[in-house]
Amino acid sequence: MSATDPLLLSESKEVQERFSQMLRETLEAIFNSFSDGSAFSGIDPYELRAKINDLGFLPEEGKGFEKVLEETEKVILPHMLRTWSTEYMPHLHSPVLTETICSELIISCFNSSLDSWDQGPAATEMEVSMINGLVKLFGFPEDTSDGCFTSGGSQSNISAIIAARDWYCAKKFNYDVKMDGLPPEYSKLRVYTSEISHFSMDKASHILGMGYRAVRKIPVDSKCRIDVKEFAKMLEEDVAAGLYPYCAVATFGSTDFGSIDDAKSMRELCDKYGMHLHADAAYGSGLIMSQKYRDRISAISLCDSITVDFHKMFLLPISCSAILVKDKDLLKCFELHADYLNREEDEEDGYINLVGKSMQTTRRFDALKVFMAFQTRGVKGYGEIIDKAVGNASYFYERISADPEFIAPVEPELSSVVFALNSGDEVNKKVRRKLLSEGTVIGQTVKDGRVMLKFTLLNPNLEHSKIDAIIVRIKELGRTFS
């Protein structure tokens, strides 16, 4: 190690000064990559692949930080997606609040791990504090509820399905899956979710050994919400056939349409059949911050568990998610004790070891990002961000639904709008690809067998004038390719 190449952070003023210089140089490289506002350089994937491969993998002798940063600035940064651009709107992939970028630096510098108290004292206590606040925020009872941060919505959803499976088998069959493996009735267990729900439900069923066929896909209505009558019919038929419905998933914001299922009616059916009700609110949970739109997810407190993604509407860096449970015992399915990590006597002496609540062992201090964002913005500031996103989606929908050149099949409840030019599938595909080459990135999906385009509007800096300009450009390209 030398002053020009500090190996680790330390108390040394020389090291701190050099590291500060490295940070300044890195920021300069980032800012130099900023363009005229476009979201993407438009580079061809084959050209970009060749440029990246030319950088090499592992040199015999290190190049030093300056050289590596120079290559990064030249080859990589110009072709990064600029998520803060108002021309980036394809996915639930948000720009990030500036204070949370600073929180990521703190997280990386200290490199805390959330599995045991002695690997992250302040980090552990902060996560516990934030979880306690979150369960209250979403209407769960403070004395019985719990949760933990996860790597993303998929892990949160899978964790919920595992917990529901173990809970149901204990209640229905007096069977301990954690100790004894799968019960004889396992092949007859069924989970119910919307036909347009997130694919992590299928992934969870595969991981649990039940397979995709154990996931019953409920048809949706014209607003892309679960058809409750079809759900009730499906449950009745499955029980009559000797199957065991153990869990249902209410989607609070479908990926494409932002649709919100009728969780109140689903709760009634789950109570009737003794089922766990999970809320996949990875997308729609952000509405909890909005006085104007909060009522749209008011039924979320009726669910037994909730997935919250902070790297979507909350505008936090990837990744940051949490699973919340109304009954803290649900998370005991992940609890194991290791002599070197989470000794039982530690808990008795006040040392909290969070490894017993999670599928993961090593976990990042993601709660700090939520803390810094919440404290910086407050309910009012966050409410303005959420209201802007939902309002922009409503504005865009009103514009295109009144335009005969477009179709817009579903009125948005959140901030995503699915639409298409009336010119046919190939035209819509070409329009999206051409926009990408120009630096404007929008989404593409399918509805009823038809290729659709998609705006996912999360950026609070997006103004109506920009929306209008993109509409004009889409129409121009549509006429060109027709």
Tell me what each language-model feature is:
Residues 2-144, 456, 462, 473-474:
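N-terminal entrance/gating region of PLP-dependent enzymes' catalytic architecture
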Residues 101, 122, 156, 163-332:
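Conserved PLP-enzyme active-site core in the AAT-like
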Residues 134-166, 216-219:
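Short loop-beta-helix segment that forms the pyridoxal 5′-phosphate
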Residues 143-144, 186, 410-415, 446-452:
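Short Gly/Ser/Thr- and Asp/Glu-enriched loop/turn motifs at secondary-structure junctions
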Residues 254, 273, 298-401:
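Active-site C-terminal subdomain of aminotransferase-like
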Residues 273, 447-482:
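PLP-dependent enzyme catalytic core of the Aspartate aminotransferase-like
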Residues 407-434:
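Conserved PLP-binding catalytic core of the aspartate aminotransferase-like
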